[in-house]
Design a protein with these regions (language model features):
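Pyridoxal 5′-phosphate
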Residues: 5-431
Length: 431
């Protein structure tokens, strides 16, 4: 199909004499990111504060800010022309950047606005039938819980939630995997978990669970296969793994947390042989999807990216700056990011373990923890502890769960000195 004829059919063809705005932005990567101080210098974070809650909502590094500014300027100058000139190429570019980061095929990556959107689309679009069983846990976020409830109600399926550990700091991988897999029933069709629990900091052994499910599936027909879905947001941007390493079927994450990407962006990844299990909820605006509807592209099977990236117009200045966020991580190196985040987190946990009035909930082992560190201060609620820390200019967060712990989450924008200051502030928090 000719682009011009597609645009005429959508009523958007430009006048003959129109001058198209300059092509899409390419960020200069002339800044060296080989020291953590240089990495930090890329952010406009207030240097008078210690920022320990980037996992909640991130600040953007310079290349992301520059890309957003550029796209916003171009949209403000001539929105329709800028969109027309770039829409067909920009979204596939973003999928490609995400796919490169997770070592997957770009056709497997749908663009979303958040983890919540990805999970909502995944679970409510999941093909279940009456009597099918969904197995989940008691440690998941509101976004998973509610999406599963809507899915169960829609399909007359059941949900069972198992508790994998009573106390995260004492849990073992074997115990958790054993508890989860033992709860799988013949009618279980969907297992839904969270990679890193934002309520406790626990990191689940996703690959071991995937292998256990694969082994159960080897004795089932394709029709009875269990699908394994993961809310991956708090491992994404921390751990040095690929989708193949994780071994799940679907993976949802936003990119406005540990990836430091534009606010209102995220991905939903689907393994090719699982695509058929999900039906779309929001029509995609991809070139192939819309073109087929217009009758200008022969009807055919759409890939996951083209079918499951929800359409409607978006805050494109943000969405189209996602590539720069992935590039930023790749320029530093995924392993370096993982090692640094674990190093600072371990330092914090070791320090907190020695404070009498602190109860650390997150496992110390990096096998079972990622970048989130959860704790309680004796005699204080999590909100009170976080408020008290903020008077010392330390920005943490209280986990938004019915039972809430305080969280400090050092990342690659922090340093050892800041971690020491957090430990010192917590030593004196009751004074
Ligand atoms: C485990 C988990 N899943 C999902 C979400 C929702 O994230 P989003 O803002 O990307 O929808 C959060 C929020 O922090 C979370 O902690």
């Amino acid at each position: 199909m000719q682009r011009r004829s597609f645009l005429r059919r959508t009523g958007l063809a430009l006048g003959a004499g129109a001058v198209l705005p300059s092509l899409s932005f390419t960020s200069p990567s002339n800044v060296s990111l080989d020291s953590w101080a240089n990495v930090r210098s890329q952010f406009l974070l207030d240097p008078k504060r210690i920022h320990m809650a980037q996992m909640f909502l991130a600040s953007h590094p310079k290349p992301v800010r520059d890309a957003i500014d550029h796209h916003r300027k171009m949209f403000d100058e001539s929105p329709v022309e800028y969109w027309e000139h770039n829409w067909k190429t920009m979204e596939p570019e973003m999928c490609k950047a995400a796919a490169n980061y997770i070592q997957a095929d770009p056709t497997e990556v749908a663009l979303t606005d958040s983890t919540t959107m990805g999970l909502g689309l995944l679970y409510t679009g999941f093909q279940l039938k009456e009597g099918d069983d969904i197995l989940s846990t008691t440690h998941d976020h509101y976004a998973t819980d509610k999406s599963l409830e809507y899915a169960a109600a829609k399909n007359k399926a059941t949900i069972r939630r198992v508790t994998l550990y009573k106390e995260a700091s004492n849990a073992t991988a074997d115990e958790m995997v054993g508890t989860l897999t033992k709860a799988i029933q013949p009618n279980t069709k969907l297992v839904a978990v969270t990679w890193v629990h934002s309520v406790s900091g626990m990191k689940l052994p996703i690959r071991t669970i995937a292998d256990a499910i694969k082994s159960i599936n080897s004795n089932r027909s394709d029709q009875d296969r269990i699908y394994f879905c993961v809310d991956g947001v708090h491992g994404f941007g921390v751990e040095d793994v690929t989708m193949a390493d994780l071994g799940c079927d679907f993976f949802a994450a936003s990119t406005h947390k540990w990836i430091f990407g534009p606010r209102g962006t995220g991905i939903l990844w689907g393994r090719k042989d699982a695509w058929n299990k999900v039906v779309p909820t929001i029509p995609a605006f991809s070139y192939p999807a819309y073109g087929m509807w217009l009758g200008m592209i022969p009807q055919g099977k759409l890939n996951f990216c083209d079918l499951h990236s929800p359409g409607g117009f978006h805050s494109f200045e943000n969405r189209w700056a996602l590539k720069e966020a992935f590039d930023f991580h790749m320029q530093i190196g995924k392993k370096k990011v993982a090692d640094r985040t674990h190093q600072l987190g371990s330092m914090l946990k070791e320090g907190l373990r020695g404070v009498n009035h602190i109860k650390l909930h997150t496992p110390v082992s990096t096998e079972l923890s990622s970048g989130i560190n959860c704790f309680e201060v004796e005699g204080m609620t999590s909100e009170e502890a976080i408020k008290k820390l903020s008077t010392k200019k330390i920005i943490g967060s209280a986990a938004p769960y019915p039972i809430s712990y305080a969280r400090l989450t050092p990342s690659i924008i922090n340093n050892e000195e800041e971690v020491k200051m957090c430990i010192a502030a917590l030593e004196k928090i009751k004074e």
